[in-house]
Amino acid sequence: MKLVEFDGVLMAASMKGIIRSTNGGENWALVINEGGVGIAIENIQGGFAAITYNTTSETRRVRTSYDGGKTWQPIDAGLPATPLIASVIQVGENFFCGHPDGIFRSSDKGKTWKLLLPSIENKVFNLSVSGNVIYAIPRNGGC
């Protein structure tokens, strides 16, 4: 389970979805469920980005929140549907997504996505950022 904090709000990926706490972790509320699992949660400028997995449709969704995790907007309409989206990060004004088709970039907060680097056969990239450097770690079949 990954935990991130922004402006006093804690967010975490859990086996039931994405959970939120506004009192230092004493109480938690489920904020994204979709009948699935919380895969990842990341800090982005002004909020959070989350990846969830729906066990019924077998797809992963990518969403952002800019109000402390109260509401979430989908940003994955331009990404090919898949059960294996591994990560989403922000560097500067750009979002990057580790996807089975490769690494995608969005320069408009997820409205559109462009393939930057095609995938390696049977791999999906987990992305990590340090400053302005993006590290892409290939993994078999996603997370």
Name every feature range the model reports, one short phrase each.
Residues 1-143:
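Extracellular glycan-interacting surfaces
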